[in-house]
Amino acid sequence: MLQNIRIVLVETSHTGNMGSVARAMKTMGLTNLWLVNPLVKPDSQAIALAAGASDVIGNAQIVDTLDDALAGCSLVVGTSARSRTLPWPMLDPRECGLKSVAEAVNTPVALVFGRERVGLTNDELQKCHYHVAIAANPEYSSLNLAMAVQVIAYEVRMAWLATQENDETAEHEETPYPLVDDLERFYGHLEQTLLSTGFIREGHPGQVMNKLRRLFTRARPESQELNILRGILASIEQQNKGK
């Protein structure tokens, strides 16, 4: 089940950080590392700092875009240390661990970490169902990438161990949630429908689509509910064609 949890690093710029992250992951039983458009490729320094977790580096999936890394996932959590223009559903690391383990019973989960200096962009954070923030010392809150991964990975492991000690499988939802791919298709369909009705203007959607993403992220529709919404959009399009 832990194999279903992806640690996703976006545009990492130092190979040593890749190795340190691999070590942090493996100590907590996580091995599924994804590298999104890394600015450098894993090298001997990454292997050296992995300190016995070189297999995690060797098996890492290297992809061009964040969408590639999120494909097939039903839950995405992005790390964020900064306040944003649009508030987003937040988790603390413990809640993140519990949700990740519960969801990973059935489908892949992505825990996304940003660039060493600037983290994740607003656009990248809007692809996440939740944001997670580590409550570090406000007078000195500087966690490096591997430290942040270690904190989250520890909480994932604690949540997983709790299910083992109770001789139970992780609690999971009976009703399936749509994968990230399905949600992105829905958002594309929604934007196209709003354009065709004149609700938003071509090239100038303003904050409407961002706020709608936040609304549906907060509501987190089930797969059947998303299908209903897609059906409504299709019906609107059909009516427009008949005019």
From Swiss-Prot:
Record carries keyword Methyltransferase: yes
Gene that encodes it: trmJ
Family matches, as Gene3D superfamilies: 1.10.8.590, 3.40.1280.10
Reaction(s) catalysed by this chain's protein: cytidine(32) in tRNA + S-adenosyl-L-methionine = 2'-O-methylcytidine(32) in tRNA + S-adenosyl-L-homocysteine + H(+); uridine(32) in tRNA + S-adenosyl-L-methionine = 2'-O-methyluridine(32) in tRNA + S-adenosyl-L-homocysteine + H(+)
Enzyme Commission number, as recorded: 2.1.1.200
Subunit and partners: Homodimer.
Organism: Citrobacter koseri (strain ATCC BAA-895 / CDC 4225-83 / SGSC4696)
Cellular component GO terms, alphabetical: cytosol
NCBIfam families (UniProt xref): PRK15114.1, rRNA_methyl_1
Pfam families: SpoU_methylase (PF00588)
InterPro entries, A to Z: Alpha/beta_knot_MTases (IPR029028), RNA_MeTrfase_TrmJ/LasT (IPR004384), SpoU_MeTrfase (IPR001537), tRNA_m1G_MTases_N (IPR029026)
Localization of this protein: Cytoplasm
Organism taxonomic ancestry: Bacteria, Pseudomonadati, Pseudomonadota, Gammaproteobacteria, Enterobacterales
A GO term, aspect molecular function: RNA binding
Any Gene Ontology biological process: tRNA nucleoside ribose methylation
Protein name, entry field: tRNA (cytidine/uridine-2'-O-)-methyltransferase TrmJ
